């Protein structure tokens, strides 16, 4: 679920949840920073500001036998510039929040396998775009803007290891001497887990509150409830906060995108040109619940049920938490980093509101939540009824989606008469999907099938499975479709556990390009009720070098330890199928417009292949390589 689209939806749909930062009424005691949300823009700023440093950095990194690859105390001018700007921005953010109890910096460590699949797709897509841009500049004999392989911002690389050491040994000790905050902590890239999930693991462990212990005001209360502030740009932070009973505000840069004049005017009044904003999660929780309660009341005015109280303060706390968990679970259906969205689902107000109304209609009849807040397990009776309802409305979702997709055209298109030829070609690359769809008969024919509406319901399903799963005959592949459905259902269970209690199954991932159709999912649940959701023991995280081998395309092999890089390059005849050339990728352009929306079709990489590579090269790792591959824990800065 992309944060720009989701955040835009929230800002348009709910008033009173955004505040200027700093804010006199908000006094967080605990401040947590999802550091990758700072590192990436800092690196981009330094690339644009210091082009000579970038050139030098690329030269130093390419000398694989040089000091850069063996001396962990050697820092380039580019790295020093990044450290300086990173420190400046951290000082600004800490100065806004002024925490008194906890300052916690979390950097993305080794991710669960499900996240690695998404990272791999994203890195291949970036490699494809980078190569195409280089081709365009060569064609017009133009000097390209400075570039640097930002895949280096991955656990296990030299760059990120040294950046973590800078924070540990230089920045945070200085901050410790100058600050009155009680506890300063660093959760670096060698500690497993995504940054935002590590933050919430810490909150759950050190600030436990029952889901029935709710507080609807994000301020410091007389009872001593601590207010937690988290800096970050990821939509995951919103979902994680909704599943946590603590009082939380999110800090982020003020957004600059709203679809309508009315939205822009309202947000401008609320924020008055501030650079940073607070997102009040407790207020957002209230708006979600108020919206649901209003729909329940309107749809069943004569009902004397206890789920329609006179105010939020009298709402059954268990019901409140259950409604919020269900809301998060519903958002998974729009897709996230771990599961693709259902065909016909996209984050826009009409679709989200339609699903909420359907959910309310089911809940007021069944009084069952999708998720049991005590166990974190899905209630398959409620889930079955839900997918039956979605299946009954599947064609309307698809029709609305296709209609909206056909209206979409590139903004600021390449036909601008003031554009130079190179600008027009770069713009055409940005709108890669739109132009490829227009000029590829096979794709145009496929899209026409989806435009036929309910009269071609079976044809639409056949076309969908052929495009995303390579299935020519659904009748001959019922067993495969059953496997797809069961994988997806387990993925929903995995997701809610990941957001509520943390990740137990590090190895699970969804191995397909698309979600099953609602018809097949509904029929599968009905035929095999209850669907078995396997219990798994806690599975340990992968190591940093394993993640590098999972997520890096061959164009970024320079970031690997020398022994591994040499082995891979010598054996590309064998490993090449798992590491395809980024210049020759096919993309999913169906009903897409922009390149950033398209996922490349790349082969899945078995963990056995990764383990084989590591086993064959482990004797060639030097001391620096070994340090980069070690697992760490949260470090307290004394």
Where are these predicted regions, by residue range?
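Noncatalytic, typically N-terminal accessory segments of nucleic acid-processing enzymes
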Residues: 1-638
């Amino acid at each position: 679920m992309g944060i720009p689209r989701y955040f835009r939806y929230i800002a348009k749909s709910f008033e009173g949840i955004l505040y200027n930062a700093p804010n006199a009424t908000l006094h967080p005691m605990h401040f947590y920073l999802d550091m990758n949300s700072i590192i990436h823009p800092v690196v981009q700023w330094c690339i644009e500001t210091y082009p000579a440093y970038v050139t030098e950095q690329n030269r130093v990194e390419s000398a694989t036998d040089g000091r850069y690859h063996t001396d962990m105390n050697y820092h380039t001018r580019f790295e020093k510039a990044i450290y300086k700007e990173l420190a400046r921005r951290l000082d600004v953010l800490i100065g806004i929040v002024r925490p008194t109890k906890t300052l916690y910096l979390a950097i993305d460590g080794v991710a669960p396998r499900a996240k690695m699949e998404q990272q791999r797709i994203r890195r291949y897509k970036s490699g494809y775009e980078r190569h195409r841009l280089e081709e365009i500049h060569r064609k017009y004999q133009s000097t390209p803007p400075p570039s640097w392989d930002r895949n280096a911002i991955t656990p296990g690389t030299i760059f990120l290891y040294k950046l973590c050491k800078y924070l540990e040994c230089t920045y945070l000790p200085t901050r410790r001497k100058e600050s009155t905050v009680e506890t300063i902590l660093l959760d670096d890239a060698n500690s497993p887990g995504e940054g935002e999930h590590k933050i919430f693991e810490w909150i759950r462990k050190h600030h436990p509150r029952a889901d029935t212990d709710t507080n609807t005001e994000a301020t410091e209360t007389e009872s001593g409830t601590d207010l937690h502030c988290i800096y970050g740009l990821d939509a995951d932070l919103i979902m994680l906060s909704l599943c946590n009973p603590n009082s939380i505000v999110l800090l982020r840069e003020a957004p600059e995108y709203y679809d309508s004049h009315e939205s822009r005017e309202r947000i401008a009044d609320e924020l008055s040109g501030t650079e940073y904003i607070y997102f009040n999660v407790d207020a957002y929780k209230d708006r979600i619940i108020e919206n649901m309660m209003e729909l329940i009341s309107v749809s069943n005015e004569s009902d004397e049920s206890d789920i329609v109280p006179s105010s939020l303060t009298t709402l059954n706390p268990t019901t409140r938490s259950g409604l919020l968990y269900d809301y998060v679970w519903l958002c998974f259906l729009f897709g996230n980093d771990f599961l693709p969205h259902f065909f016909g689902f996209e984050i826009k107000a009409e679709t989200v509101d339609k699903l909420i109304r359907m959910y309310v209609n089911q809940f007021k009849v069944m009084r069952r939540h999708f998720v049991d807040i005590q166990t974190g397990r899905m209630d398959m009776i409620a889930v079955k009824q839900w997918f039956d309802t979605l299946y009954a409305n599947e064609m309307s979702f698809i029709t609305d989606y296709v209609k909206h997709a056909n209206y979409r055209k590139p903004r600021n298109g390449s036909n601008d008469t003031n554009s130079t030829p190179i600008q027009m070609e770069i713009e055409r690359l940005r709108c890669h999907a739109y132009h490829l769809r227009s000029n590829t008969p096979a794709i145009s024919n496929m899209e026409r099938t989806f435009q036929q509406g309910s009269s071609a319901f079976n044809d639409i399903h056949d076309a969908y499975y052929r495009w995303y799963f390579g299935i020519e005959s659904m009748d001959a592949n019922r067993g495969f479709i059953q496997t797809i459905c069961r994988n997806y259902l387990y993925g929903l269970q995995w997701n809610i556990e990941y957001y509520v209690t943390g990740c137990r199954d590090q190895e699970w991932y969804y191995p397909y390009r698309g979600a099953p159709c609602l018809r097949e999912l509904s029929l599968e649940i009905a035929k095999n009720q209850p669907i078995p959701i396997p219990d798994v023991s806690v599975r340990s995280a992968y190591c940093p070098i394993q993640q590098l081998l999972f997520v890096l395309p061959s164009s970024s092999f320079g970031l690997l330890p020398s022994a591994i890089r040499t082995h891979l390059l010598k054996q590309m005849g064998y490993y090449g199928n798992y590491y395809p050339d980024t210049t020759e990728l096919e993309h999913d352009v169906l009903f897409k417009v922009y390149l950033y929306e398209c996922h490349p079709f790349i082969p899945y990489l078995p963990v056995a292949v990764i383990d084989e590579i590591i086993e064959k090269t482990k004797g060639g790792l030097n001391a620096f390589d070994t340090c980069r591959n070690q697992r760490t824990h949260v470090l307290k800065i004394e």
